[in-house]
């Protein structure tokens, strides 16, 4: 860790990865609990857009400067394949899910983000010559229009790549100094707390009516699939605006000083890859039923609270070792491996 480490961004990432885990845990029970629907919907309004914004914010050193660091593209793709293989092995051989298939470039589940990162890095490198405002506006337009194409879907996770690309661009182009100054405003922080409380109340008391729009939060499906073939573009634009608003709120209210959770924000990659297989295993082996036996009235609360120790355990440093090796690959090392294994 360097002396210039941005603890605020680490804290934000710690919060976001915790929300990722909570959101995926809640998704198992959205059909049986209105509270789970609320948790899922509110989290998905902003957690991936903000995560992707931060991904763009921190990717500048990879894209800018001299040689394009293609190793990052390769690293993310290797991690994507690794995650995909873990999921495939778990479903196919661990739990004998017969319809499980392995399609290298077709991904609609949790590993999609890692494949998208490889694509976004390439896109930003190719497109960075264009004016930022123009590129962001075009990307937003593309994100809205793509929903009208029912043929774009999980191949190369293309729908999500296009829908979430504006957030990646915003993170990449935002000026660091202005960004830090903006986040230091105490007045805006107070205003953000008010917006957060109002947003939570609005979503909570209207979840029965708005939950039907959950498909717009994932960026995966066409408007036809979401049963909004005409007004889908309007709803996506609304999602963009809400995502920006709540992401800004999150950035403003998270503390900038080092906390006990800061270290978690420095190890989000390993948590992202390992959490879903763990959650799936817990659910498969009747872990929720065990909580019911403890408290029939409060078992769902206990179930969600379990996400905290899951995040903490998965942030243990040794668990990140294989992923860190992959992320630190160097082109020279890759060429040596290739030369040792010629066709």
Short names for language-model regions:
Residues 2-343:
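Alpha-helical transmembrane segments and their immediate juxtamembrane cytosolic regions
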